[in-house]
Amino acid sequence: MRTLEDSSGTVLHRLIQEQLRYGNLTETRTLLAIQQQALRGGAGAGGTGSPQASLEIGAPEDSQVLQQATRQEPQGQEHQGGETHLAENRLYRLCPQPSKGEELPTYEEAKAHSQYYAAQQAGSRPHVGDRDPRGGVSGGGRRQDEALRELRHGHVRSLSERLLQLSLERNGARVPSHMSSSHSFPQLARSQQGPQPRGPPAEGPEPRGPPPQYPHAVMAQETAAVTDPRYRPRSSPHFQHAEVRILQAQVPPVFLQQQQYQYLPQPQEHSPPLHPAALGHGPPSSFGPPAVEGPPSAQATLGSAHLAQMETVLRENARLQRDNERLQRELESTSEKAGRIEKLENEIQRLSEAHESLMRTSSKREALEKTMRNKMDGEMRRLQDFNRDLRERLESANRHLASKTQEAQAGSQDMVAKLLAQSYEQQQEQEKLEREMALLRGAIEDQRRHAELLEQALGNAQSRAARAEEELRKKQAYVEKVERLQQALGQLQAACEKREQLELRLRTRLEQELKALRAQQRQTGTLAGGGGSHGGSAELSALRLSEQLREKEEQILALEADMTKWEQKYLEERAMRQFAMDAAATAAAQRDTTLIRHSPQPSPSSSFNEGLLPGNHRHQEMESRLKVLHAQILEKDAVIKVLQQRSRKDPGKATQGTLRPAKSVPSIFAAAVGTQGWQGLVSSERQTDARPAGDRVPAEEPPATAPLPAHTKHGSRDGSTQTDGPADNTSACLASEPDGLLGCNSSQRTPSLDSIAATRVQDLSDMVEILI
């Protein structure tokens, strides 16, 4: 099916291309109209999916095809007819599918077939009601019948040859010159020499020439067609031109008749289409145009006669179509019956073969059963003989066993008498052993109680020894603590005494300096008194300021004395608090030891408890040691806090001592130094409070923001003695002349401060080492 469609579409496509390239405009338009009719029919059948959809296009649509066709290049749409449209066409269903080894039709046959196919399609559109609804039967059953396929093949081949012969007979006398001389129409030349047979042609290869070469000008054809007396004018305006009359010689007569029916106003529009068989068997004179041109009345009579003839032909065609469809239905029914019969025969053959195989298996089974029955009979006889022998053996064994039992009963009575005598003796011995065991058990219980008492005494002694050791350790620790605290207290007292002595010396030195300054101020006042009345007010203001300065200095000295007194009280309270903390720590350790001592001790009777005793003892020792270490850590923390507090307060005293190092401007310098000292003291207190409670760092360096003192106490490496190092520098500066006091303070202050800081850090580290 696909091969025939491709071949017909390819031939029509080549013909249109060559006509567009070499032919005239009228022939090109006609071929394009044929192609568009074929494409429109294929598109209608492929779009709706039913044969009736392709037949609903009316005759006026076919009459406008020649006017709408224009010259265009081939767009590749010639193959879009679809297999559905070809399967719906009756002529294609009658046409067989060529096999791979079959020869394709020739160029002229394909051309005539395509023209007739387009004309048949255009003519079969109005006749919708004449189609049988069973015409769309699937072609699967028809393709299975090879005889029917060969018959249709021959019928279609004879039909195409008949159409070609009719066209040659009609057009042979008109254009004999150019048709016979064309190399592309070899069959036309052969048809002029002799008529072609009705039967199918041979299957051998046919000679084919090159593609047709159409002339560029058809003037000779036009003149020949005009002078030909057989051409007569038609009633339709499309047949008034010479090009159309020339094209009539190349188009099959059926196509011309269909075109003529479109312009005749007859009520036979819906008559059935012309059957190819009727066309093939009709007289040739009925398909040609009228030979003589006459008046309109003669043309009307000719048209009516022609219409009557066509009606008879169409009725015959419809009858043949009905007969053909009936025969097709009968053939399909007979083929179905034959298929059923063949299936029944196959089933019967299969059943017979199964029956034969079943008979063979049943015979084999019977023979096998017979052999097995014989074997079973022999086996049963053998087993019966064996059973008889076993029964005889059993009877002889029973007789032998009865004789043996009688002998055994006589011997067993003697043995029972002997065993009774032996059992009586053994019972007496057992009672004696039980009495001895009871005595031994009582002795063992007494020994066990004695051992428990000894173990309890040993445990009590060990616990008392451990308690004594713990108390001894605690007392030793208390003694060491007391010794350390006494040493620290002696050092604190010595430091306090030295500090009081230093304060006394500083106070006396400051009083002397104050007296010297007052004397100097009086001298300057007397010298400046003779200067005039203007200096009187300045002298009064200076005297007033000096009095205020003296009062402030006295207040500062009183505050310093109060501060030293409160510091001493604070240190004493701190020491008392430390003693209270140590007492609390020792009380907690003692409470833990008493809890451990009064805890229930396991009995050492079992070996497992004896193995656990050393482990428990070691565990208790470790706990007591950890508690002692914890108490020592608390003591050291308290000492470190005391030292930190001292280091925090010593810079304050140093700043108080350096409140008046200068003599020229004492009030301003004292205010600045006092502010810096208090800021340093506050920052050092914040840093100390921010440290965690469990901090075990032995000493802290003084904060960088705190001002370093101009005089402080520093001692030797053992911390026993303390001297005043930088104070000598200060006294030297104070003993010098008043004019050089400021220079002494500014030049000697920096190295003295550095040395004081170094000695203070060394003092603190030595003190911490001694206390720890």
UniProtKB/Swiss-Prot annotation:
Residues 80-91, 100-112, 142-153, 686-699 have a biased composition (Basic and acidic residues). One of its GO terms (biological process) is endothelial cell morphogenesis. Phosphorylation at Tyr-107 is necessary for efficient binding to SRC and synergistically functioning with SRC to activate the downstream MAPK pathway. Monoubiquitinated at Lys-343 and Lys-404 by Crumbs complex-bound WWP1. De-ubiquitinated at Lys-343 and Lys-404 by USP9X; the interaction may be promoted by cell contact inhibition. Deubiquitination of AMOTL2 negatively regulates Hippo signaling activation. The modification Phosphotyrosine is found at residue 107. It is found in: Recycling endosome; Cytoplasm; Cell projection, Podosome; Cell junction. Residues 41-158, 170-239, 260-299, 596-615, 680-752 are annotated as: Disordered. Residues 197-214 have a biased composition (Pro residues). Residues 101-303 are annotated as: Required for interaction with CDH5. Expressed in skeletal muscle at neuromuscular junctions (at protein level). Residues 221-303 are annotated as: Required for interaction with CDH1. Residues 178-191, 718-733 have a biased composition (Polar residues). Belongs to the angiomotin family. Part of a complex composed of AMOTL2, MAGI1 and CDH5, within the complex AMOTL2 acts as a scaffold protein for the interaction of MAGI1 with CDH5. The complex is required for coupling actin fibers to cell junctions in endothelial cells. Within the complex AMOTL2 (via its N-terminus) interacts with CDH5. Interacts (via N-terminus) with MAGI1. Interacts (via N-terminus) with ACTB; the interaction facilitates binding of cell junction complexes to actin fibers in endothelial cells. Interacts with CDH1; the interaction may facilitate binding of radial actin fibers to cell junction complexes. This is Angiomotin-like protein 2. The gene is Amotl2.
